Amino acid sequence: FNELYNYFEEEWNKAHEILNNKNEEEFFRNIIKLTNEDKKDKDDLVSPYKIFLKVIYEYFEFINREELLCSPADYGYRDYKYQIDAIKSGINGIMLYNGVLISDVVGLGKSIIASAIAKNLLLKEKVEEIIIICPPKIIDSWENYNSEFQIKAKVFSIGLLDKALEYVRNHRKNRLIIIDEAHRFVNNKTYSYDMITNICFGNKVIAITATPMHNTTSDIFSIIDIFDRKLTKNKNIEEAKIKILKEERELKSKYKKSENSKEENIKKSKEIAKEIMSLIHTIIIRRTRNDLLESSEYRKDLEKQKTEFNDVEEPKLHDYELGDLSKLYYDTLEKISPYNEDNEDNKDNSNIFKGVRYKPLIYLKKKTIEDKRKSAEIVKEVYGEDANFDFADLSSNNIAKFMRHLLVRRFESSIFAFKKSVENMIGKYENIKRFVRGRNYYPIYKRGDVNYEDYSDDDNDIMIKDNSKKYEGLYIIENVKEVLSKEFFIDFENDLKILKEIKKYWENIGIEKDKKFFKLKEELKKFKKENDKRKIIIFSEFKDTVDYLYESICKDEELNYLLKPLKSVADSKNRETVKANFDASLEERKQESEYFLLISTDTLSEGVNLHRAGIIINYDIPYNPTRVIQRVGRINRIGKKLFDKIYIHNFIPRLEAQKDIKNWQISNFKLTLINSIFGNDTKILQKDDEINSLFSLKREAGIFSDLENDISWDIEYREIYNKLNQDNNLLEEIKNMKDNIFIRRENDFNGLVEIRKGENGIFGGLLKNSVMDYNMANIFKILKAKENEKSFKPSDKAESLIADFERRKNIKKINYKPDALLKLERYKEIMGLEISLNDREYIEKIIKGIEYNIFTEKQIKNIEKAFKNNNGIEIFKEIKKIIDYSSLNYINYIESDYFKDSILVVREEFFKNFDK
């Protein structure tokens, strides 16, 4: 009762007086007047077409109404219309949802857009400070933007998240956090994800990435979850996310089994894409070059500023004969990663490299109770208190599988990289043997969630120190002979034997038998002859391959003379040389022409302009196709057009059997989803169907979605808005239309649409067959009408639809109560007066935060651990370490209702087969 009474008093005190003895007569006179006007309006129903135009006008006018206090032109850049619109949309999204994902394709100026948004928010006094978090290699670039736009930002490396978090907690301010290359935070179960979430919690956020999806569509949601605690935390949307992820898993399974045709895969990918965009479009800015060319407004602006895009030619595949190495190639593949490696029958095959060194926990003894106790202790010590044997097995297998796949990728990259990896692995295996024999202990990886994209070289992050048992990133298994089964030592020796056999097979294979390199040489000479002024970039995943190619080309007198090769290395002097020779955005007086060929790893494919080059050679195909997108994006930039066409060349072996084509298959499958969801300008791997002839396969080895012509959902409506602004009479009529319009229309479903406008934006809801949808793309599609369509008065059933809409529109809370929530509720009651009023409010806010699903999984687990490992007031002290007290003011923002204090613009009732 007391809680309800206090709530009533609180709301009552907020109330405004609207009627008293002094204004009674005027008040009721106005009521009668408004009632008569309302009745007149209802008798004179507005057509659905005019309503549709009104919604379009209100939607785009709100964005355009955003007054910018500065633009890129104020800081030495051009004011492109598409960038100005993105800046306005970004500010709108940040004010409405506390964050925005800027995901324009590579080369359209995402960093400029983000910098301009940051400067405007500072000038508008919406934020007090800017923090930028980015990879080390682009810190210099961001320091330049920092200086140019005068935003006085604190710039932190992604590798120093702990420093960023410490700074945020020690210096309380209203901030904007800019996260560049946000795709690095797609795994929401990692320590770094937990860190970035804590840094951003309660702050405004701009996440930047051209490639927000790496492995699954859940990647996109993980990035958005860093800042969004409102839109996608709605239970309706949570359920939709679960459904989408399930559909994707089913599609992937059918793809692997070749149950679907290529056309079916693409069709289903597009369906999944539409569902995803229906959830996130309001907090993502994503345009392709085709969007800019499709929009007459953007196209004219680009033409006016004499800005053209490069035409990217169809990618060309260069398959090379393996010749005498063909049998050795296949035999080696079968040893390190057999085609049916997931088949359990392989477990006892002594001819297969298992990667035993990376998964010793699988061999923990479990025969006796004491064995199980000791083994369980080791598992918990390595992976945490919640870990069990199943988790340890899964994590161990993940790291072993990763290392085998890494070996395959290096094998497919170059003979040199592969031979070096085998030698390194043999050395590491021999080191482990010495540790076991001499000291009876074993160093083991603590990481089970290895990210394929984060590792390019061998496991050289293991740092073994002779005089210390402190291993960076490792745990030491002591008394190893007593805790590991004899099968471990047998399989370990077998792995070592296989590695030595492979080394022996390949040790006499040198550059003279490297068919891939000879194919490259042949093509390079041809490129140089055909394109005299066109510079070339060769990309590889691996530094060893880059070194090998650079040294081999330098030794070839003809190529060295023709191309003057440059190798990209990680130092500032080399980076300046690369920019001087390959960056067309530099002042002409700073540009040089000393080098015509650049050989680089993917570290250079992000954050650097290389558009003086017109040819890209992918010497190997990454496991993740977003890497290839980023490679191409380095030379396909907005601004100066140097070439009519850009060329992409991909190198792959000509396989004569269905052996290991996993990289290509996986890349094509993922690329279909990526392009379906986000659209892309360019084919980057293959021409349609060309892969089949290359691999001589009876079934398709890959799928590629030809989606270059896909455009963003709002381009069509933006065109209507622009035409409306050119018709003065119609525009004036639409502008003078009153709000609070309510009509009924015929359609193929039962439902209701509402469009509202509030302080921070135009938003809406669609209730269709008892399911809520907040996607404006879907709502606009429903509102779309022909000029001759008629309106009808709302039916008697409208009130029940409105009630259903109100009930469903803001369902935020979770469907279940986790242990942490139950324990906190009990704890609050038990502690009573032992904690202060402020501390009780703190606990209540954490409870609400859990109900609204705003904390990470790790935070929830840590709260549960606090209860498990502590008692009384110590529990509270531990919780305060987990959830920062001041950040919980963010709960007030979460609880706010978009629909509260908003104005109803339009409400349309839909019935199928209704009585007119």
Please identify what each model-predicted range represents:
Residues 164-167, 213-217, 547, 592, ...:
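SF2 helicase motor core recognition
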